């Protein structure tokens, strides 16, 4: 993936920035020569009356209405709690979460799908195997990690190498 040197973080979409302003910001971002847009399924779960997915939904509407999907390197994340047991990096939850994100984003693939947090309760072999399945199915182009410690990232990279499966290609540290 070839990304611009800066990513536009979509955390604000759907709570501090409304849909119309979000569309204008995304248009300006692309017009300025940038291409990398980052969001997460959990944005903006914490706002009263929200259920998560609001940012992805706005980005999806913008992608569909603008026709600019081919110009965007789209990143999203999963794994933080969205309530009702929707949390973690189990293979079953990864499969469920990617389908929900694809639907909200109104696209058939995600360029960079990231683990938003480590999940110590799920073996890395299982998590990375599920991500590998998504890459092979064409639903995800690459995978990344967010909020991982250096030792845990190293362990994940070792697992991927040992098993010959998709590996974390990026690290997004805590803001």
Language model regions located:
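Short histidine/acidic/glycine/proline-rich micro-motifs that form metal-
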Residues: 12-14, 42-49, 80-81, 117-120, ...
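N-terminal binding-site loop/beta-alpha segment at the start of enzyme catalytic domains
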Residues: 1-72, 108, 136
